[in-house]
Amino acid sequence: MHPAAEHSPLGKSSEYIATYSPEQLFPIPRTAKWAELGVTAQTLPWQGVDYWNCFELSWLLPSGKPVVAIGEFAIPADSPNIIESKSFKLYLNSLNQTVFTSLGALQVCLEKDLSAAAGKPVGVKVRTLAEVEAQGVVALPGQCIDALDVAISNYEQPQPELLRCNPERVVEETLHSHLLKSNCPVTGQPDWGSVVVQYKGRALDHASLLTYLISFRQHADFHEQCVERIYLDLKNLLQPEHLTVYARYVRRGGLDINPYRSTGPISPDNKRLVRQ
């Protein structure tokens, strides 16, 4: 478990406060997990963003009438902190009986509080239900590798030694899988995800990638660190000209988390998959 997470509200009984309470937000430094991967804030081998989508966002108009919406938050991948997910939920719930005079006032409040917790400016969009409904759901790009016939029996830790490639052949391709699963390092609850791998580099053996992703099944870590581990393991193997790893996790507690890590400019979309 991340030492800071032991003091977070995650996995503990909590009082749900219905009026504005920014102190609910609990930042967790990224540095400890980066150290496990052998990187520092000064040597990060990726650019990226963590998209958080909130489906339980509500507040009051000055008339007392409630409003509901969907919040989209973009936390830079090089921010000093992640925000612990239950504390994020408690903070958002604290807006439920809080009056905002306008959508702009709400957005300014969210940007201020979330940026303070993350340690870097956080992008905020508040979207109407009709807007999100019209967008619908999308399919992941590239080739799905889930139908490949693989065998695996060890799910306790990610196993990069399972990955194989052809060093004599360079390809550019996009692969995806819906079989990513890990566990919350605090509560042990399952985190279900889909992941896209886009790269140009040594030809990756598709079956070995699928087996490697499945090896995360009982691994305990936060969403962001799982994606960073996948990114680094693939980068070390493929020596790619470019590499992107983008995971879209299933919603829990009204929030879904979608980490994106890439060698190139940050350009992901934030469109829902069928399980989101």
Curated annotation (Swiss-Prot):
Positions contributing to NADPH binding: 85-86, 252-253
Pfam families named among the record's database cross-references: QueF, QueF_N
Chief place where the protein resides: cytoplasm
Recorded metabolic or biological pathway in which this protein acts: tRNA modification; tRNA-queuosine biosynthesis
SS bond list: none
Membrane-spanning intervals of the chain: none
Residues forming the catalytic site: 184, 191
Positions annotated to bind substrate: 83-85, 223-224
Alphabetized SUPFAM superfamilies for the sequence: Tetrahydrobiopterin biosynthesis enzymes-like
Record-level Gene Ontology MF annotations: preQ1 synthase activity
Subcellular location(s) per record: Cytoplasm
UniProt GO BP: queuosine biosynthetic process; tRNA modification
EC number: 1.7.1.13
Gene Ontology CC: cytoplasm
Top EC class of this enzyme: oxidoreductase
Keywords, comma-separated and alphabetical: Cytoplasm, NADP, Oxidoreductase, Queuosine biosynthesis
Reactions listed under catalytic activity: 7-aminomethyl-7-carbaguanine + 2 NADP(+) = 7-cyano-7-deazaguanine + 2 NADPH + 3 H(+)
Classification via InterPro entries: GTP-CH-I_C/QueF, NADPH_dep_7-cyano-7-deazaG_red, QueF, QueF_N, QueF_type2
Signal peptide: none
Family per similarity comment: Belongs to the GTP cyclohydrolase I family. QueF type 2 subfamily.
Self-association and partners: Homodimer.
Function: Catalyzes the NADPH-dependent reduction of 7-cyano-7-deazaguanine (preQ0) to 7-aminomethyl-7-deazaguanine (preQ1).
NCBIfam families: QueF (TIGR03138)
Protein name: NADPH-dependent 7-cyano-7-deazaguanine reductase
The organism of origin for this protein: Pseudomonas putida (strain ATCC 47054 / DSM 6125 / CFBP 8728 / NCIMB 11950 / KT2440)
Gene this chain is encoded by: queF
